[in-house]
A protein has these predicted regions:
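Glycine-rich phosphate-binding loops at beta-strand->alpha-helix junctions
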Residues: 65-72, 218-247, 262
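Short glycine-rich, Thr/Ser-proximal phosphate-binding strand/loop in the N-terminal lobe
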Residues: 3-44
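Conserved phosphate-binding/catalytic loops in two-lobed NTP-binding clefts
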Residues: 81-88, 245-267
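Adenine-nucleotide phosphate-binding core of ATP-dependent small-molecule kinases
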Residues: 177-227, 262
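Glycine-rich phosphate-binding loop plus the immediately following alpha-helix
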Residues: 122-176
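Conserved phosphate-binding catalytic cores of ATP/NTP-utilizing and phosphoryl-transfer enzymes
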Residues: 2, 73, 79-107, 112-122, ...
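Glycine-rich phosphate-binding/hydrolytic loop that grips phosphoryl groups
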Residues: 93-98, 136-140, 255-276
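Short beta-strand-loop/turn "lid" adjacent to the catalytic site in phosphate-handling enzymes
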Residues: 23, 32-35, 51-87, 118-125
């Protein structure tokens, strides 16, 4: 029987709650629960985590909570010491731990987007954007009548951006040394009557990821490292990888999506207590 106690990190986000346990150097099966009510999703996630990992309440030493929903929690969970941790710190700790880096620009892509600069133990919030998962679902709901992210991803699979976006090659015959001809000159700047549902779905995903990736590249310019670590729910969208790879041809950055990236903030919450 493992007697080392577990530190639990819970990230109560805008649309989902993520939970993860850390015992020594081991990450215990992370889980995600969808819920609109922060308290319901907190206890739902915690109960599921305890049950599916066959844990007892006594095996848990402390619980770290973070995320926008943590403001609704004002007492300990099942009499276990419960500590609120600032979300930006969690993003930094989690991003560095999952990527194995000592310093990086960490981008948390959830309902909106937050960017921190992390160097060893120093975490600095540098900004963000309201463009994120909420933008993606809001626009896809209005433009395509699609309200589920999985359906949007599936619809976008065969999408052709050249029916939606204006590319550099569409407006310039000259080769620009710092701008590949396939780069976007204007998102949705060339939308044609021939654009299919798939094309528009891909255009929306591309718009959101290009905006986030470009902002991250600018934020990283004043950093000592060119590495950008992506965490949060949006990292699970397959097209994220492709869009960021294309941005690497324009900017001097390396975009990294580590394993368990969607749980980065929850991991950071648990680590913030362990570091103490």
């Amino acid at each position: 029987v493992n007697t080392v106690k577990i530190t639990v990190g819970i990230d109560i986000g805008g649309s989902t709650t993520k939970i993860i346990g850390i015992r020594g150097d081991e990450i215990i099966t992370p889980m995600i629960v969808k819920a609109n009510d922060p308290i319901a999703s907190l206890f739902g996630a915690f109960g599921k985590f305890i049950d599916q990992n066959a844990l007892s309440l006594g095996s848990i030493e402390r619980i770290a909570i973070t995320g926008v929903g943590s403001s609704h929690v004002d007492k300990s969970i099942y009499d276990i010491e419960t500590i609120k941790v600032q979300e930006f710190l969690c993003n930094g700790y989690g991003g560095l731990h999952l990527s194995g880096l000592k310093s990086a620009t960490i981008v948390s892509m959830g309902t909106g987007t937050a960017i921190v600069r992390a160097c060893n133990g120093d975490i600095e919030h540098v900004g963000g954007t309201g463009v994120g998962g909420g933008t993606l679902l809001g626009l896809s709901n209005r433009m395509l009548n699609i309200r589920e992210i999985d359906l949007l991803i599936e619809t976008a699979k065969d999408g052709d951006l050249s029916n939606v976006d204006l590319l550099v090659s569409d407006i310039s015959r000259d080769v620009l040394p710092t701008l590949p001809s396939k780069s976007t000159a204007s998102n949705f700047g060339k939308i044609s009557d021939l654009a299919s549902k798939s094309d528009i779905a891909m255009g929306l995903i591309n718009l959101v990821f290009e905006t986030i990736g470009t902002l991250a590249a600018f934020a990283a310019r004043s950093s000592s490292t060119n590495k950008i670590v992506l965490i949060g729910n949006l990292t699970t969208i397959p097209q994220c990888h492709d869009v960021m790879r294309a941005l690497e041809a324009i900017y001097p950055n390396e975009f990294i999506i580590p394993d368990h990236a969607e749980f980065g903030t929850a991991v950071g919450a648990a680590l913030s207590l362990i570091k103490k």
